[in-house]
Amino acid sequence: MAEQLILKGTLEGHNGWVTSLATSLENPNMLLSGSRDKSLIIWNLTRDETSYGYPKRRLHGHSHIVSDCVISSDGAYALSASWDKTLRLWELSTGTTTRRFVGHTNDVLSVSFSADNRQIVSGSRDRTIKLWNTLGDCKFTITEKGHTEWVSCVRFSPNPQNPVIVSSGWDKLVKVWELSSCKLQTDHIGHTGYINAVTISPDGSLCASGGKDGTTMLWDLNESKHLYSLNANDEIHALVFSPNRYWLCAATSSSIIIFDLEKKSKVDELKPEFQNIGKKSREPECVSLAWSADGQTLFAGYTDNIIRAWGVMSRA
């Protein structure tokens, strides 16, 4: 049965681009968003006809753009990365910052939790990758064989049998690092422009990367090789694998594309109807993506400050 995605509702509350989104398996009615307005919002999802949810709590503390956010696997904590050069660990039940992570010398662009939530990795415009413990101590800074330009994205593999970190940069490289030694395992070469995003499949076997060249490259993390590429035909801002279907979603500067990885074809292309867009002004672009844990809802953050929720439906 073929499937498609339908716009189910919106979440409005940010006063800047929605740069990042995170969901929780433990708290299916919660969504976390980070924004250029320097704040994060914990949303309570109601899935009503009129509003898909409401802001339950706003997290203040960063003094510049929030670039990335992630929720711990137990749903109790969140991490945020900011252009104020710091990371923050938040207790979601109270909305308080429990730790500040200070050490990067330029904007922090990306943050990720290890599968056991005991380690944290961050990537920055200072061209370094830092590993931290949850107490806020920097345990290691990766510079040897590191990126020669901004580090745009860092992600831990969820697979405990192959504990690696994947990073991407404006030097057009995807790098895979062995977690135990923090040594470079593989340089994945092939992109012709800067890379904005990497994402790892739920089982840790696949990695996808995308950016300026409009091509999504898929890499086998177990065999350390390039598998194939999918053309999105436009700059890619964000990528995310579905948690329960063999799909990859790419947010580009013109639409959101859902790829079926088995058929290597497009399942759907999502483009909302934007109101009040003049001929000269640019249409809002999707710059962040997150799936609900059950894989039924795709959350998309846009440059018009709105989060849109798309639901998977069977085609009639």
UniProtKB/Swiss-Prot annotation:
Top-rank taxon: Eukaryota
The entry's localization annotation reads: Cytoplasm
Quote the cellular component terms of the Gene Ontology held in the record. cytosol; cytosolic small ribosomal subunit; nucleus
Which BP terms does GO give this entry? G protein-coupled receptor signaling pathway; GCN2-mediated signaling; maintenance of translational fidelity; mRNA destabilization; negative regulation of cell integrity MAPK cascade; negative regulation of glucose mediated signaling pathway; negative regulation of p38MAPK cascade; negative regulation of translational frameshifting
Q: Which InterPro entries match?
A: G-protein_beta_WD-40_rep (IPR020472), RACK1-like (IPR045223), WD40/YVTN_repeat-like_dom_sf (IPR015943), WD40_repeat_CS (IPR019775), WD40_repeat_dom_sf (IPR036322), WD40_rpt (IPR001680)
Q: Which Pfam families match?
A: WD40
Sorted UniProt keywords: Cytoplasm, Repeat, Ribonucleoprotein, Ribosomal protein, WD repeat
Question: SUPFAM superfamilies attached here?
Answer: WD40 repeat-like
Q: Which GO terms describe its molecular function?
A: G-protein alpha-subunit binding; GDP-dissociation inhibitor activity; protein kinase C binding; protein-membrane adaptor activity; ribosome binding; signaling receptor activator activity; structural constituent of ribosome; translation regulator activity
User: Which residues form the WD repeats?
Assistant: 13-44, 61-91, 103-133, 146-178, 190-220, 231-260, 281-311
Subunit-level organization: Component of the small ribosomal subunit (SSU). Mature N.crassa ribosomes consist of a small (40S) and a large (60S) subunit. The 40S small subunit contains 1 molecule of ribosomal RNA (18S rRNA) and at least 32 different proteins. The large 60S subunit contains 3 rRNA molecules (26S, 5.8S and 5S rRNA) and at least 42 different proteins.
Main role?
Answer: Component of the ribosome, a large ribonucleoprotein complex responsible for the synthesis of proteins in the cell. The small ribosomal subunit (SSU) binds messenger RNAs (mRNAs) and translates the encoded message by selecting cognate aminoacyl-transfer RNA (tRNA) molecules. The large subunit (LSU) contains the ribosomal catalytic site termed the peptidyl transferase center (PTC), which catalyzes the formation of peptide bonds, thereby polymerizing the amino acids delivered by tRNAs into a polypeptide chain.
Q: Which family does it belong to?
A: Belongs to the WD repeat G protein beta family. Ribosomal protein RACK1 subfamily.
Q: What is this protein called?
A: Small ribosomal subunit protein RACK1
Which lineage do the record's taxonomy fields give for this organism? Answer: Eukaryota, Fungi, Dikarya, Ascomycota, Pezizomycotina
Q: Which gene encodes it?
A: cpc-2
